[in-house]
């Protein structure tokens, strides 16, 4: 197209980014990529390879080595042997290495960006302007965290060896999210990148060599899901961090249960995007374009559920459709393209199938009229309205450029619709009323809520989910604690208390007292209709306790879940109640000590010390109740990031036989 024609039509011209240097880097490796283990990039003999292709045209980029069990063992062993020295060198020395990585990422930023786009299919402007700068930011931030660890976190130490598995939607950024805090705190790492997108991780391995990272501190193993499964189950791993689907996260949790490994899961989402009638609609439309069509909607926190207040719904949908008409879809290496390629034909097939099946339940579909390229994996930006809140499209994560919309009447209804999901990763609230925003945001069950914005990420602000979106935080001070454990004096091993047996005949001690269950603020008899005897160390019957069954457990969990007023109560009130419990326990100190003696057979002094410790714990937790403050994070945006503490929810506790009262408190 000539300049004159461009000026007459005002159409976008092509602005292609060169892939020459990235392809030269691949050719330098003869098109075959190895593993990074113990400071060396290698391809062990006899290994299989799998292909990685450019999703925009289906052409082969490179062949990636499939790691074996022996390779995983070697990587974990290298990390284990390197960990004591890495932690022992101290935070300031580790900080220099992280700083070097940050500088090298900036020096090679264009190569990283181009390689990321070739491998993943996201537009080059997203890789260049968003992903890579944020990768460097994470290493800069965590270099500072390492520098200050001994002053600011002197009561913490590294966990050990971290096994990390990352997804294909943000390959290098997820690598930085995982590796930077882990090595900053003195851990060593074995990381597995996604099968579809391993190239930037292998380029990162090369800059680790350039930065002089000690052998074994960082290890990269490539392969399919079988490699990840073996890695997280490896007995040499102390900490597992995974970002990916909820289904795989659930399997990981089951696989490592009982192994004593620390775990962070950042899983799927179905994030709500709330637009109130007083919002700046034009800004909200632009924000929505970023929320759902950024990275082709392949974002765990994508604002894929749109809720607009009824009074402005028609206007907002019209503006949104007009904006969709202007979206450019095509070669992600074109700097003027808005929406790139889906990462793989399998993912494209999954998106198509979910949408077609979901539309059978109802809904009106509108697609961007932009012409799709003939080759590659592309899906048009899509809006589906007039769907039921319980339908599949509204409830299931599509992980593609598909937006599902509905309306609401009142703020209370908006909150109810937004929380009507099994996920809880993020949310966006659009309103010009700051009072409304500050009222709505804390009511949303999610890890992150953005006000008049979306997809705001920074290394200084923690990110993570609730419900089936996972647990744990990455980024900020919260993310540092995910890779440390407290330093404390060795605990004394408690002697095991054996169950006492004896005669079921009670002593003649007067009127019988029935020990019932305590559920929902009242004493209730067990649904089972059974009671179990409790004997003293001499074999005498102390009393009968109710034997709970499944229904009792269900009733107890339901009562605890419904007691939401406790979490919403003022911290001062919770503190006063805990103090009051401590006062009442103190008044009956001797009675509780006698019961402990009769049940465990311990000395009177030990029983009294246990009761005293329980009272002390109650007063300590009461003291902390109104002092557990949030934080204001310093993020490099025009705004402020507030970290607000929230209760975990309903907690199930199994008390030990040892120290029965203190264990309960």
Cite the ranges covered by each PLM segment.
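Residue-level signal for inorganic ion chemistry
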Residues: 58, 94, 116, 186, ...
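Glycine-rich loop-to-alpha-helix module at the N-terminal edge of alpha/beta enzyme cores
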Residues: 59-149, 539-628
């Amino acid at each position: 197209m000539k300049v004159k024609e461009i000026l007459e039509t005002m159409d976008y011209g092509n602005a292609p980014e060169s892939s020459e240097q990235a392809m030269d880097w691949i050719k330098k490796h003869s098109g075959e990529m190895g593993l990074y283990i113990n400071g060396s990039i290698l391809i062990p003999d006899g290994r299989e390879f799998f292909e990685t292709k450019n999703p925009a045209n289906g052409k082969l980029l490179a062949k990636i080595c499939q790691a074996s069990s022996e390779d995983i063992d070697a990587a974990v062993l290298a990390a284990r042997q390197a960990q004591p020295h890495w932690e022992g060198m101290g935070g300031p020395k580790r900080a220099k290495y992280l700083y070097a990585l940050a500088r090298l990422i900036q020096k090679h930023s264009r190569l990283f960006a181009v390689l990321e786009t070739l491998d993943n299919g996201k537009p080059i402007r997203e890789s260049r302007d968003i992903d890579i700068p944020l990768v460097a930011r994470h290493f800069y931030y965590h270099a500072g965290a390492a520098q200050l660890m001994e002053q600011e976190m002197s009561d913490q130490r590294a966990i050990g060896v971290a096994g990390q598995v990352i997804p294909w939607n943000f390959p290098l950024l997820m690598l930085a999210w995982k590796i930077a805090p882990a090595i900053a705190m003195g851990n060593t790492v074995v990381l597995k990148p996604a099968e579809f997108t391993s190239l930037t991780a292998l380029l990162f391995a090369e800059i680790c060599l350039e930065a002089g990272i000690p052998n074994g501190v960082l290890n990269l193993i490539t392969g399919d899901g079988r490699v990840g499964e073996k890695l997280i189950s490896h007995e040499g791993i102390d900490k597992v961090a995974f970002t990916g689907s909820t289904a795989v996260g659930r399997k990981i949790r089951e696989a490592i249960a009982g192994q004593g490994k620390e775990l962070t899961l950042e899983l799927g989402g179905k994030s709500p995007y709330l637009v109130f009638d007083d919002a700046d609609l034009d800004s909200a439309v632009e924000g929505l374009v970023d929320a759902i069509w950024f990275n082709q909607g392949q974002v765990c926190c994508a604002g894929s559920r749109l809720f607009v207040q009824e009074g402005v719904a028609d206007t907002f949908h019209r503006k949104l459709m007009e904006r969709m008409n202007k979206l450019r879809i095509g070669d992600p290496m074109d700097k003027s393209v808005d929406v790139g390629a889906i990462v793989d034909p399998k993912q494209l097939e999954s998106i198509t199938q979910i949408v077609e099946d979901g539309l059978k339940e109802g809904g009106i579909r509108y697609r961007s009229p932009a012409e799709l390229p003939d080759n590659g994996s592309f899906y048009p930006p899509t809006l589906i309205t007039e769907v039921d809140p319980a339908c599949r499209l509204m409830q299931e994560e599509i992980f593609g450029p598909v937006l599902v919309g509905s309306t609401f009447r009142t703020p209370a209804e908006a909150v109810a619709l937004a929380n009507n999901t099994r996920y809880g990763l993020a949310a966006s609230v659009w309103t010009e009323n700051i009072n409304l925003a500050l009222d709505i945001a804390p009511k949303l069950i999610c890890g992150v809520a953005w006000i008049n914005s979306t997809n705001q990420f920074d290394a200084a602000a923690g990110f993570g989910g609730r419900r089936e979106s996972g647990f744990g935080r990455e980024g900020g001070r919260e993310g540092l604690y995910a890779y440390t454990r407290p330093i404390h004096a060795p605990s004394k091993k408690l002697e095991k208390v054996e169950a006492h047996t004896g005669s079921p005949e009670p002593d003649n001690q007067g009127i019988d007292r029935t020990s019932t269950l305590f559920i929902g603020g009242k004493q209730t008899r067990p649904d089972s209709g059974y009671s179990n005897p409790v004997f003293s160390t001499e074999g005498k019957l102390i009393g009968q306790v109710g034997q709970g069954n499944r229904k009792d457990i269900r009733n107890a969990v339901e009562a605890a879940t419904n007691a939401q007023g406790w979490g919403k109560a003022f911290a001062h009130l919770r503190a006063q109640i805990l103090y009051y419990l401590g006062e009442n326990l103190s008044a009956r100190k001797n009675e509780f000590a006698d019961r402990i003696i009769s049940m465990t057979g311990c000395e009177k002094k030990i029983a009294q010390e246990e009761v005293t410790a329980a009272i002390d714990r109650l007063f300590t937790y009461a003291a902390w109740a109104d002092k557990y403050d949030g934080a204001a994070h310093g993020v490099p945006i025009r705004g402020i990031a507030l970290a607000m503490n929230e209760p975990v929810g309903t907690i199930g506790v199994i008390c030990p036989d040892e120290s029965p009262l203190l264990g309960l408190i």
